[in-house]
Amino acid sequence: TGRARAGYNRSPVWRGGAILFGPQPRKYDFKVNKKIRKLALRMALSSRLAGDNLLVVKGFDLPEAKTKIFAKIAGNLGLSKALIIAPEETRELVLSSRNLPGITLTTPDQLSVYEILKHKQLVLLEGAVEPVETRLK
């Protein structure tokens, strides 16, 4: 008849047929040097300090794991979208802060530039200042 040979009915030419060059899995991650990562962390912290969005809180002890108590303290400090850096994640801190929208709890070794820039305010608890400083050196 002069028409091109289509082969079988599951050929990529046909509707409902095979996929010829389908999507391939790719890696989109790339390496960032240690010096650049440290510089980015330093710049993120200095931007929060320059904008008066960095608080250092002394004596932030919770008597029990209650969100109500934590919300009251956060309200008194004027925190809305804040990243709280604690020296360690205690049971009371984790349980009382996890249900508050916009408030994230982290430790100095888990601190990331993305988290700092994502949150408007940065709260350093007293014991977390020194580990953050040692990470910047």
What is each PLM-predicted segment?
Residues 1-21:
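Glycine/serine-rich anion-binding loops at beta->alpha junctions
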